[in-house]
């Protein structure tokens, strides 16, 4: 009987078993989602965990992490103590990547080079025509984030640093006086 048990144990040890892979879920910032997708693809290819990351915005990712509906959250800015205090399972904050924020525009034939003050005035709706920037006379529509976003926080911090005329404040969400809002970067 002892020999049978040893043989049976050997059979289990030597028999190939379907590889059990860890699955992780995360949510948060859309800004780094492209690099995260690449990293998670490479990780899975190397037999690492499979990661499902939803680029829902920093604010939603933070909430999902606090609510324990995901394994990890990602944000463009670190959690504040009031949010850290809500986390019941432990927390490690790690800087993952850096990036830049740029003004994108769609106006063929317009070679735009904004000053910092012009950037502030476009974002605040003070400049609302391309003619004011040296381009053809047509309405300028400002597009901005509508969801809670670490990118918006970084952007509004820059606008405030650029000019004393910036009156919208700073943060993951501000009350934009003009424009069209959309989710994600």
Stretches found by the model and what they are:
Residues 20-185:
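Flexible loop/hinge segments at secondary-structure junctions
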């Amino acid at each position: 009987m002892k020999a049978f048990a040893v043989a049976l144990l050997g059979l289990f040890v030597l028999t190939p078993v379907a590889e059990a892979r860890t699955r992780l879920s995360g949510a948060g910032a859309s800004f780094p989602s492209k690099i995260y997708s690449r990293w998670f693809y490479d990780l899975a290819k190397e037999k690492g965990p499979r990661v499902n990351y939803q680029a829902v915005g920093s604010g939603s990712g933070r909430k999902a992490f606090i609510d324990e509906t995901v394994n990890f959250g990602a944000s463009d800015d670190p959690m504040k103590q009031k949010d850290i205090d809500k986390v019941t399972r432990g927390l490690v904050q790690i800087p993952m990547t850096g990036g830049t924020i740029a003004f994108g525009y769609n106006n063929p034939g317009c070679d735009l080079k904004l000053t910092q003050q012009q950037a502030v005035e476009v974002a605040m709706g003070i400049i609302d025509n391309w003619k004011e920037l040296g381009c053809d006379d047509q309405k300028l529509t400002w597009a901005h984030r509508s969801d809670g976003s670490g990118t918006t926080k970084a952007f509004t911090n820059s606008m405030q640093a650029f000019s004393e005329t910036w009156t919208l404040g700073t943060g993951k969400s501000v009350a934009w006086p003009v424009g069209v809002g959309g989710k994600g970067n």
